[in-house]
Each structure stands twice: as structure tokens, then as C-alpha cells.
Amino acid sequence: MTPKKEQYARKAEGWTDAEYADARAYLDHRAELIATLGAPLRAGEEVLDLACGDGGLADYLHGSEYLGVDASSEMVAAAQRRGRNVVLGDLNEYAPPQPVAATTCFRAIYYARDRRAFFERVAGYTEKKLVFDLNPRQYGVDDVRADLRAAGFDELVLRPFFSPQRHALPGPAASLLHGLERSGPLARLLLKARFSYLCAAFRGGRN
């Protein structure tokens, strides 16, 4: 086990609470956008969460069936102790037993050994959309869009995601930031300094 994996394993118990200053506000906003961005999800549809950690997102995807996958056995055990439906697997190799409506991958696209091949694999078992985050200061949007198109995802919706991970905000401040996600030029200006996009890739006209 590499030192990084050992550190990850040691933090498995209580991972979500330790990683977010306000886990409820952060994950609730993310779950809302997973359900509504791009092709909307209907009640009862299944969401596959790749590299899910302890599966904390499961508690906020109200109305959806949740399946989490993580490569750390310690994270999987921590998730299962909380009653979350999480199994062991590598995002580069895992395929669910049956197709899912949506797949999400949070802060983990960089774990893909080959990004285009990863998108192609996900497209093979995802019926509606792939939702993931993208740091525009680290990855070229046009390059990612090209890889998605090659995999069959011909539509891409990008939504600025202005929820701080390490800082808890009072309700009015959080609402203001969420409003700025739709502010166009101002949102793009903020993205030059920090934050990321939440992206929904899907097949146009077939969802």
C-alpha cells in the first residue's frame, strides 16, 4: 500500500465529516445538481458514485437508488457500517451488474488511467448522464468535451459550483454564492481564481 493510500485508509472512519466544514450544505447542493443538471433524474432511478469514499453523498440523493464504489476496503467498510450500499472496486475497471441512470465521479477523474477510455466505459453502462467536477485551471474544457464526444456523450452542460469545501458559510452567504453560479461573466471570473464546474454529459435527445 502506498503512503497516500495508507493515509486515506486511516481517515476512513468519519471521512465525510472530516473533509467538509459543512458536509450537509455541500453535499445537499451537489446532490440537487446531480438530479437536475442536464437530463433530469426521476424518483427511483439508480445513481452510481465512483470513488465514493465512505458514501456520504448517499444521504442526500433523496428519491434515488444509490450504489457507491471505492478502491479502499477501509472506506467500503466504513460506508457499510453506516448502512450505505457501497462495494469495492476500481473506477477504471468496475461495471455495475446492470445499467444505471446516472454515474457521478467527484474529485476523481484524475484517477482514470486513460480519460477517453474511462468515458467510453462509463457510457457503456450509463443510460442518462455522467456528472463530474472539472477544474478549468487544471484541465482544458475543449479537450474534455472532445473525449466525451468520442465516448458518445454529445451534450455537455457546465455549471459553476460555488460551495466551499473547507469553510462553513452562514445561510445568506451560501445562497449568494449559489446565485452567482448563474451570473455568467462574474462566475467565469471567479472560476479563474478558485472553485470548479459541475458537468453533466449526456446523449442529446435520447434521455
Segments (PLM) and residue ranges:
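Conserved class I S-adenosyl-L-methionine
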Residues: M1-P40, G44-G53, L180
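Class I SAM-dependent methyltransferase SAM/SAH-binding core
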Residues: G53-E93
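A short acidic, Gly/Pro-enriched loop at the edge of an enzyme's catalytic core
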Residues: Y94-A102
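A short SAM/SAH-binding and catalytic strip from SAM-dependent methyltransferases
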Residues: A102-D114
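Conserved beta-strand signature within the Rossmann-like core of class I S-adenosyl-L-methionine
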Residues: E127-P136
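Short alpha-helix
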Residues: Q138-G152, R159
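A C-terminal cap/extension of S-adenosyl-L-methionine-dependent methyltransferases
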Residues: A146, F162-N207
